[in-house]
């Protein structure tokens, strides 16, 4: 089946996968979605025994239909190699009745590596397929993890440049150090005075500026995105849910056809949307449990049908989820509207102009695949300690949000489905908060982030990977700070300097 992509907001033009990857976002500001949805063309039985790269090919070929077999396999083999610290790519661990899918074994210790390791190869291949002559400028907003993963993926990739914006006070010390020490000659990192939503809105505004796009194209540049608004980010994330299910069958933890519930710590809605797409492919997933922190805009949406961004924004110990405008939810809303782009566009307009929208009863009735919960800061810290005390397994703050919500769901329901937790980051990325959970009386004695990491190594018996250890004494290269309304001018300056 030849899959074409359409905008969630009604742009009539149908584009290929490679064109959608290059554009990042549709000309009308919508997000690209498959016009028709494929199904797995191999049975789960046939997928048994395949490694991660092989399953990645079987899943991604269904969506990226204008890539040849050779092109797609080359992208996959280049992405999922020795830069991951385990041959499995995504190992699974059992702890206290839950199965943790460890998505943090890539170079930047976060799940974003799963997609951002392959996106540069997909993009360069797409550029060749479409005879693109211009240099691709990747614009990315980050709440912490996407930034470094994108920088690592695109560093010194020929024909590309990348500019990352992050909230000055909204990332962990480790995340900041990862970004500001990036050595790639085609990279720029900028702190903005604002939160992640300000950074994301600024990037979207730049993408939507047709005058700026025309000016830069004339000078040989085009924009694209490494955020999960890019379909090239979303498709690789579907893979690990299929892989996890197949491995659980192989290990006797599931019988073929058993429903598997999935609980995902959620900010921008991309990771859980990928699980939804996996279910649509035919994977036997049960409930998709959306886990929020105290910025619980998604929890409230699933409970009330109203998405309301007009609320207090809180900086939490799970900063990658500190988001009030969850971009990928638009792709779900579009499907709830029966792909009525005009209806979806109206909701998105209401969100911009009024700060909220409410879906109708028919749409709300289609949300039965989803459950939602949230964890307070206290819940998050207590969960880290409880899991460690019971099992010796250390989880990070975002994963702890999901574990708390999964346990809450399990205790309230009679379902006997196994629950898979998307474990999205290494605990070393948030060592201070994890230590606070494990050793209340000692954490204040460690003045540097690296002392905290060494203490966490001692407690957990795990070692920080060498690739991450290198940044401790690395030189800070990127020192730019700008106001949120200065982003466009700064982008022009950096590109045309």
Where are these regions (language model features)?
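PLP-dependent amino-acid enzyme catalytic core
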Residues: 1-497
């Amino acid at each position: 089946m030849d899959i074409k992509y359409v905008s969630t907001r009604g742009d009539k033009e149908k584009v290929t996968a490679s064109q959608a990857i290059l554009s990042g976002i549709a000309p009308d500001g919508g997000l690209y979605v498959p016009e028709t949805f494929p199904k797995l063309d191999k049975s789960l039985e046939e997928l048994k025994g395949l490694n991660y790269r092989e399953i990645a090919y079987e899943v991604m070929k269904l969506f990226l239909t204008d890539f040849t077999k050779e092109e797609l396999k080359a992208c996959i083999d280049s992405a999922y190699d020795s830069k991951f610290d385990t041959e499995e790519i995504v190992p699974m661990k059992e702890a206290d009745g839950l199965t943790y899918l460890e998505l943090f074994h890539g170079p930047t210790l976060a799940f974003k590596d799963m997609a951002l390791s392959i996106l540069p190869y997909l993009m360069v291949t797409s550029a060749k397929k479409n005879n693109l002559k211009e240099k691709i400028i990747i614009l990315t907003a980050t709440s912490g993890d996407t930034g470094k993963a994108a920088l690592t993926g695109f560093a010194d990739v020929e024909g590309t440049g990348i500019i990352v914006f992050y909230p000055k006070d909204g990332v962990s010390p480790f995340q900041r150090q990862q970004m500001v020490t990036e050595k790639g000659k085609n990279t720029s990192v900028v702190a903005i005075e604002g939160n992640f939503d300000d950074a994301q809105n600024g990037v979207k505004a730049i993408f939507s500026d047709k005058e700026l796009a025309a000016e830069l194209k004339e000078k040989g540049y085009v924009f694209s995105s490494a955020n999960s608004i890019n379909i090239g980010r979303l498709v690789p994330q579907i893979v690990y849910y299929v892989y996890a299910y197949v491995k659980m069958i192989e290990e006797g933890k599931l019988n073929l056809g058993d429903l598997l519930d999935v609980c995902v710590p959620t900010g921008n809605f991309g990771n859980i949307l990928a699980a939804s797409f996996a279910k649509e492919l035919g994977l036997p997933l049960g409930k998709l449990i959306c886990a929020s922190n105290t910025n619980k805009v998604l929890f409230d949406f699933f409970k009330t049908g109203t998405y309301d961004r007009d609320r207090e924004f809180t900086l939490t110990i799970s900063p990658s989820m500190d988001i009030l405008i969850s971009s990928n939810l638009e792709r779900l809303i579009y499907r709830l509207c029966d792909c009525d782009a005009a209806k979806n566009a109206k909701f998105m307009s209401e969100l911009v102009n009024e700060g909220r929208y409410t879906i109708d009863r028919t749409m709300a009735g289609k949300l039965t695949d989803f459950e939602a919960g949230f964890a307070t800061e206290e819940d998050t810290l207590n969960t880290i300690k409880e899991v460690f005390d019971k099992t010796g397994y250390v989880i990070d703050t975002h994963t702890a949000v999901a574990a708390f919500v999964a346990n809450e769901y399990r205790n309230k329901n009679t379902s006997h489905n196994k629950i898979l937790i998307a474990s999205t980051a290494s605990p070393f990325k948030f060592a201070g908060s994890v230590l606070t959970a494990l050793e209340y009386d000692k954490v204040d004695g460690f003045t540097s982030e690296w002392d905290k990491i060494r203490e966490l190594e001692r407690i957990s018996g795990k070692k920080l990977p060498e690739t991450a250890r290198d940044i401790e004494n690395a030189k800070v290269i990127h020192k730019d700070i700008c106001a949120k309304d200065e982003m466009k001018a700064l982008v022009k300056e950096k590109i045309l300097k």
